[in-house]
């Protein structure tokens, strides 16, 4: 019941937002048009706080490390097919969880009877891996067809981690290049600092909570980059528009006006994402827990804060608007 309510609220907000964008209903205004929060006053606190949190996150990473999942530690991979019909994932998870094999992940793919099983590497070499596979076969019985059985070693897992890290770095570089061409180099640098800030703090969160770091975590980090960039670009686009219109407005006032004018959109977006992630976090099960927990922290808690209190005020320190000259353009009635 709770899951249905949360998902229903998220869908309702999305529908209202789309209808308002296309003019079917009046534009949604979560905050009044004359809102004038002085966000730039907080930059004297946000930058030192973020610097301290970043140092703490890096320290936690080197002290505690990450709790690597099967994808990066190695282990066993079994592809099975239920002969009698659709596979019961919950039943299979209970059966395999009682074998004492450590981390066991199940994923349905292809048809409803196909299941991919990942089991953590067992201490004791190849003999221990084969013994674990035999335990699984005995537990699942004769009604299962084993279509693939593989043992993934540390070398392959290390390559996956390296490829994931390279992919993350290439995404950040791609974002930098994109913003450099769309805006100015100061905007690109500000967005890159904000994105790196989000990723570092999220990795620190994963280190302190010791939730599994696997391929879904890499996907979560890339998604966080996308959400953070999207929010930042919306604010930057409004800043660029106001820079062209108001040649004499002080930079702090201009940044405040830009953030205030996009505040309704930011609130609606993040409330919708929060409701969807909350439903997944509470009812999605263990299989996607790492992904949803990481997203909840990175998008909802860190991403929103970064776009407003890091990415925007960073432009002041990078000298954006310092060389403006001319008269303000008249505002259309």
Feature locations, PLM:
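A structural signal for conserved, well-ordered secondary-structure elements
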Residues: 1-333
């Amino acid at each position: 019941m709770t899951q249905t309510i949360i998902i229903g609220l998220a869908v309702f907000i999305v529908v209202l937002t789309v209808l308002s964008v296309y003019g079917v209903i009046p534009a949604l205004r979560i905050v009044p048009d004359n809102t004038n929060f002085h966000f730039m006053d907080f930059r004297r606190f946000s930058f030192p706080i973020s610097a301290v949190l970043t140092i703490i996150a890096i320290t936690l990473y080197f002290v505690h490390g990450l709790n690597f999942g099967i994808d990066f530690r190695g282990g066993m991979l079994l592809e099975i097919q239920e002969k009698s019909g659709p596979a019961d994932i919950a039943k299979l998870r209970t059966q395999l969880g009682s074998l004492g094999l450590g981390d066991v992940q199940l994923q349905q793919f292809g048809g409803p009877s196909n299941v991919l099983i990942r089991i953590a590497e067992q201490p004791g070499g190849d003999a221990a891996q084969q013994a674990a596979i035999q335990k699984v076969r005995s537990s699942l019985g004769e009604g299962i067809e084993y279509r693939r059985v593989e043992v993934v070693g540390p070398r392959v897992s290390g390559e996956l981690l390296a490829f994931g890290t390279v992919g993350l770095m290439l995404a950040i570089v791609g974002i930098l290049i994109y913003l450099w061409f769309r805006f100015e180099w100061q905007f690109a640098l500000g967005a890159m600092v904000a994105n790196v800030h989000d990723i570092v703090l999220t990795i620190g969160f994963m280190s302190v909570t010791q939730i599994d770091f696997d391929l879904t975590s890499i996907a979560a980090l890339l998604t966080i980059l996308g959400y953070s960039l999207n929010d930042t670009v919306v604010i930057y686009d409004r800043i660029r528009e106001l820079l062209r219109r108001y040649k004499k407005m002080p930079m702090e006032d201009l940044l405040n006006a830009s953030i205030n004018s996009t505040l309704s959109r930011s609130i609606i977006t993040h409330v919708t994402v929060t409701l969807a992630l909350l439903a997944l976090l509470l009812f999605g099960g263990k299989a996607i827990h790492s992904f949803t927990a990481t997203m909840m922290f990175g998008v909802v808690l860190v991403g929103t804060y970064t776009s407003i209190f890091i990415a925007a005020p960073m432009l002041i320190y990078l000298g954006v608007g310092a060389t403006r000259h001319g008269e303000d353009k008249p505002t259309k009635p």
